[in-house]
Amino acid sequence: ALALGPLMYEFGWEINDLDLLGAGTICGHLLECGAQVTGSYFADPGFKDVPDLANVGFPIVEFSKDGTFIITKPVNTGGLVSKATVTEQLLYETHDPSNYLVPDVTADMTNLELEDDGANRVIVRGGKGKKPPEKLKATICCDNGFMGEAEMSYAGPNALARAKLAGEVISKRIETLGLQGQLRVEIIGAGSVHFSHDEESSYNLPENGDYRVRTSGIYPLKHQAQQLVDEVMSLYCCGPSAGGGGRGYVTPQSSTASILVDRKTVDPNIRVKIF
């Protein structure tokens, strides 16, 4: 919307100019994550190198009235604009490229053409649009208890075994306390992104190293989450040898759910204040 609105105003597009609205929406999709289209998140050293990422430039769009536009970035900035960076961002969070749903139009990316226009300049043309969806997306938020989260590090000889033991101790103590919640125990350095609370996750990892046990749990009541944190902190004196760097905290949690509502039930109300 932050791209499509100004384009409609500047070029005098009407709400039934569906192909133009589709092109403007695709432009907004490319811009919505900022520097991702100029090389951030794209970068993968040795495979997809991006120069001077620390000084990455944010994207600039040069838009024509016919729906064609150019993606570029400021001069003397790092990053990269190429057909590859644009393609990755086009597909980012896109479930169906032929039906990209926003309230004003259903954008169609399947006929897009990308063309290099010199260094760090890519032409995008061929955006299409179809009638807008009959239903709108709404996000519902509600309270969902409290998360207790705490960590403890183990380093040096036999560190992995000590970290595993710490995780087992915490799991058993939480069970003894009778805390009913969503408990997760993982070992950072041994597979925290891929859940590490099993033997297979640490296969072929060095026993001597630097590992950090992270424990988290979501509970209905704040004091229950605090109990989890306290148990992890107790590992200093009541856990495996030489734990250190402990920290923990409790935070309130919210859950979200997405639903579809009939657009006829939504009455837009816009208020603009000029300061």
Q: What residues fall within each predicted segment?
A:
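A conserved active-site cap/scaffold subdomain adjacent to cofactor or substrate pockets
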Residues: L20-K131, M147
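An acidic, phosphate/nucleotide-engaging active-site surface
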Residues: A1
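Compositionally biased, low-complexity repeat tracts
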Residues: L18-L20, F63, L205, L235
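C-terminal non-catalytic interaction/assembly regions of soluble proteins
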Residues: R125-F275
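Structural signal for hydrophobic packing residues in well-ordered secondary-structure cores
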Residues: F11-G12, L30-T38, K65-T68, T87-V102, ...
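A glycine- and small-aliphatic-rich helix-loop capping segment at beta-alpha/alpha-beta transitions
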Residues: P6-L18
